[in-house]
Design a protein with these regions (language model features):
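Conserved catalytic scaffold of divalent metal-dependent phosphoesterases
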Residues: 82, 88-98, 108-116, 122-124, ...
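Cap/insert and terminal regions of metallo-dependent hydrolase folds
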Residues: 130-221
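Conserved beta-strand hairpin/beta-sheet module of binuclear metal-dependent hydrolase folds
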Residues: 1-23, 104-121, 134, 143
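Active-site environment of divalent metal-dependent phosphoester hydrolases
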Residues: 34-38, 58-61, 100-101, 125-127, ...
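Metal-dependent catalytic neighborhoods of phosphoester/phosphodiester hydrolases
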Residues: 39-48, 62-64, 198-206
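Metallo-beta-lactamase
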Residues: 55-113
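Active-site metal-binding motif and surrounding structural segment of the metallo-beta-lactamase
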Residues: 10-56
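Active-site metal-binding loops of divalent metal-dependent hydrolases
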Residues: 7-9, 33, 56, 96-99, ...
Length: 231
């Protein structure tokens, strides 16, 4: 089974990664409506892959939806967002903190992978999680690098404020990881690292030292076994 995360890249790349086999795909989760996350949503829908996102995200991504198929709205209630059962995957959405209509993160569980945290485009992680085996987490920028670029006139101050209100800094990422029980975690994958405001190598080394875990930097073509056990 396979569960897709986001729909921001050309779907032909996803197809290639799947070896052309869409029969094992049980769905696609989208965190929010920005183009790098939802811009290719029609390509996914046109292959009849079920897409799931918040109502706010679906409305915000309307300009990208040009398909006879429509995404499925994840319902929100007094007790939080509804739990999804997609094949053998259980998905628990949670609210993210980003400059988007109704952004989400996801806790995903499967018998083979254990618990997976997927959190991107959020300046703060409002929840802690139990039973984590693998983590995909944003580590977007270093506040010192960001401030230095503003001081040097490389970027406007308004952009600095936007980044601070929308993305997870290295230090906040580290705090979020420390707030969770990482005992059974096999992999931490750092995602959405800014080219200009981040330092992926330094982030990886710092988080590996602080957590004692295997830490990866997300990049095209990266393959990692997300097993429940270390081997």
């Amino acid at each position: 089974e396979a569960l897709l995360l986001e729909a921001g890249k050309p779907f032909k790349h996803t197809l290639a990664a799947l070896g052309g086999n869409l029969r094992k795909v049980v769905g696609c989760l989208i965190t929010h409506e920005h183009g790098d996350h939802a811009g290719r949503i029609s390509e996914v829908l046109n292959y009849a892959v079920p897409v799931f996102a918040s109502q706010g995200t679906i409305e915000g991504a309307e300009k990208y939806i040009r398909s006879n198929y429509q995404p499925n709205a994840i319902r929100a209630g007094a007790g939080g967002y509804e739990r999804l059962n997609l094949g053998g995957f259980t998905v628990i959405p949670f609210p993210a903190k980003h400059d988007a209509a109704e952004p989400l993160g996801f806790y995903i569980w499967h018998e083979e992978t254990g618990g997976i945290l997927f959190a991107t485009d959020t300046y703060y992680l409002p929840c802690t999680f139990k039973g984590l085996s693998n983590i995909l987490i944003e580590c977007n920028y270093d506040p010192d690098i960001l401030a230095r670029r503003v001081a040097n006139g490389d970027i406007p101050e308004v952009l600095q404020e936007r980044v601070r209100r929308s993305h997870l800094s290295y230090y906040t990422c580290l705090d979020a990881l420390r707030a969770n029980d990482l005992t059974a975690v096999n992999n931490i994958v750092l995602i959405h690292i800014s080219d200009g405001n981040g330092d992926g190598v330094a982030f990886r080394e710092g988080i590996a030292k602080a957590t004692g875990k295997t830490v990866h930097i997300a990049k095209p073509g990266l393959k990692i076994k997300f097993n429940k056990t270390p081997f």
